[in-house]
Every structure is written in C-alpha cells, then in structure tokens.
Curated annotation (Swiss-Prot):
Chief location of this protein within or outside the cell: membrane
Protein name, as recorded: Olfactory receptor-like protein I9
CC terms in the record's Gene Ontology section: plasma membrane
Keywords linked to the UniProt accession: Cell membrane, Disulfide bond, G-protein coupled receptor, Glycoprotein, Membrane, Olfaction, Receptor, Sensory transduction, Transducer, Transmembrane, Transmembrane helix
Family named by the database record: Belongs to the G-protein coupled receptor 1 family.
Pfam annotation, one family: 7tm_4
Location in or out of the cell: Cell membrane
Keyword Cell membrane: yes
Organism for this UniProt entry: Rattus norvegicus (Rat)
Membrane topology value: Multi-pass membrane protein
Disulfide partners: 97-189
Function: Odorant receptor.
Organism superkingdom: Eukaryota
GO annotation terms (biological process): signal transduction
Length: 314
C-alpha cells in the first residue's frame, strides 16, 4: 500500500504557523517586512563589495558569500510561506517539497561553513596581524569558499535523495510552514532509519564541529586581546565577539536543538517558533551585525551615495 501511495502523492498540505486567524494579516505584514529587510540588507552588502575595490579583501569575500547564502536561504521558505498565508488551501507540490529541502540544506550549510571561515579570518587578523596577508592568501580564501560550496552540494544532495526514497500516505499533512526534514520524517509511511542515521552521523562534522571551531576562534581572540589589560581592549573584545557570538549561538542553538537533540516533549508550536529564529531572524540580523555596523561598509555606501548626488548639482 505504501508503494501505491508513494506514486499517487502529488502534493503536501502545510498547516502553516500556529497563529489565530484574526492575527493572520498582522503576521503577514510582519513577515513580509522582515523578508524585504533581509533582501535589501544582503543585496546592499553584495553590491557594495562588488563596486568598491577597497573591499576586495578576504574578509569581504566571505561576507559577500554569506550575504548571498542568507538571501537565498531566506528565499527558500519565505515566499512560499507568504503565498500560503494568503491561500485557502496551503500546499506545496511533491517535487517542490524536495527542491525546498535541497536548497534549504544547501544554503543553510553554506552559511554554516562561511561563518567558520569568517571566524578564522578574524582570529588571524587579531592574533597574527603581521602575518595576515601571508596566511589569508587569495588562494586560501578562494579554496575555502569553493570547498564550502562543494561540501554543501554533496550533503544537501545526499539528504534529498534519501528523502526521495521514502513513501508518504495520500493527503499527507505537514505540521509546519515549510518542508522541514525532521517533520517530514514524522509523517513518512516507510522506514526512516537511514535518514535518521545520516542526520546523526553527518550532524557532527556539518553542524557541531563548525560551531566548536567558531567558539574556539573567538575564545582565542578574547584571550589575545586580554593579554593587554585595558578598558579599551576589553571593549574591543566584546564589540568584536559579543554580537557575532549571539547570532551564532542563536543559529546553532536552534539547529542543534531541533535536528541533533530532538526532544519528545517538543511541541509543534515550539518547533515552529524555533525554526522561525534561524530561517527568518538570523538572515535578517546578519547584515546589520557583520557588515552594516562596519566602518568600511559605511564608507563604501557614503562614496556611492555621493557619486549619485554629484551629477544632480552639475
């Protein structure tokens, strides 16, 4: 019966967000504003880095790729969510669901690896400033970016192919606002052991190890700065690491809690809210925390704005 159901299924029904109907328009406006902010913030970063030659450095190479990953990561789920919030029967085609899983994993993993590269870049810049250019050579930076893209491609493809092997009952209802992998496993009609094993085995090198490397990098940064005891050095340590670590902890904390350490007590509402944190909030905050507060980015933006204003006075 599962084989018949698997071939017959053409779409999934999404329950969406657990909000009262009377607040639907309010949350629609809120999520639309958040999505547009995410698009605008990340597009500004990418354009500025492309146009300003002074930003053609290792750190901004990683930043531009991270902005692209965040922009696409948010676009994987947000447009469909906004569309379904205006639909009487929120659904997603079977092929669209698999595509959403693939790109969700791809851009999520890509941002994950880029955060590690950025943490390492800051570590070298602060702890080994005299050797920064020799260590962070263009060849190494490009290699790190290419490696990130390659690893994410294979990881996302593996999980997508494993999901495609599963059988689903007709009229399958997903208690989520997108095709979340862990939620799909709960509604599958066939054995999900291989999928769960792949998540557990690959979760370490893909999620936990990068998180630990980021923590170690920032810990070394703080330790290096504290070797020169002064109020200025302490302020520099917190300004350099505090805001970055808060977003990193928010992203990794929710991902690890949802996928690597799932609890039987986790309700659908709790899982949905946790998912909102890393699918909406983190991509929106990253441009402000990593780039828009940066003096180089502000200078580049001011130069472009001045160039556009000068012809109007001529």
């Amino acid at each position: 019966m599962t084989r018949r159901n698997q071939t017959a299924i053409s779409q999934f029904f999404l329950l969406g967000l657990p909000f009262p109907p009377e607040y639907q328009h309010l949350f629609y406006a809120l999520f639309l504003a958040m999505y547009l902010t995410t698009l605008l913030g990340n597009l500004i970063i990418i354009i500025l880095i492309l146009l300003d030659s002074h930003l053609h450095t290792p750190m901004y190479l990683f930043l531009s790729n991270l902005s692209f990953a965040d922009l696409c990561f948010s676009s994987v789920t947000m447009p469909k969510l906004l569309q379904n919030m205006q639909s009487q029967v929120p659904s997603i085609p079977y092929a669209g669901c698999l595509a959403q899983i693939y790109f969700f994993l791809f851009f999520g993993d890509l941002g994950n690896f880029l955060l590690v590269a950025m943490a390492y870049d800051r570590y070298v810049a602060i702890c080994f400033p005299l050797h920064y250019m020799s260590i962070m050579s263009p060849k190494l930076c490009v290699s790190l970016v290419v490696l990130s893209w390659v690893l994410t491609t294979f990881h996302a493809m593996l999980h997508t192919l494993l999901m495609a092997r599963l059988s689903f009952c007709e009229d399958s209802v997903i208690p989520h606002y997108f095709c979340d992998m862990s939620t799909l496993l709960k509604v599958a009609c066939s054995d999900t052991h291989d999928n769960e094993l792949a998540i557990f085995i690959l979760g370490g090198p893909i999620v936990v190890l990068p998180f630990l490397l980021i923590i170690v990098s920032y810990a070394r940064i703080v330790s290096s700065i504290f070797k020169v005891p002064s109020s200025q050095s302490i302020h520099k340590a917190f300004s350099t690491c505090g805001s970055h670590l808060s977003v990193v902890s928010l992203f990794y904390g929710t991902v690890i809690g949802l996928y690597l350490c799932p609890s039987a007590n986790n309700s659908t509402v709790k899982e949905t809210v946790m998912s909102l944190m890393y699918t909406m909030v983190t991509p929106m905050l990253n441009p402000f925390i990593y780039s828009l507060r940066n003096r180089d980015i502000k200078d580049a933006l001011e130069k472009i704005m001045c160039k556009k204003q000068i012809p109007s006075f001529l």
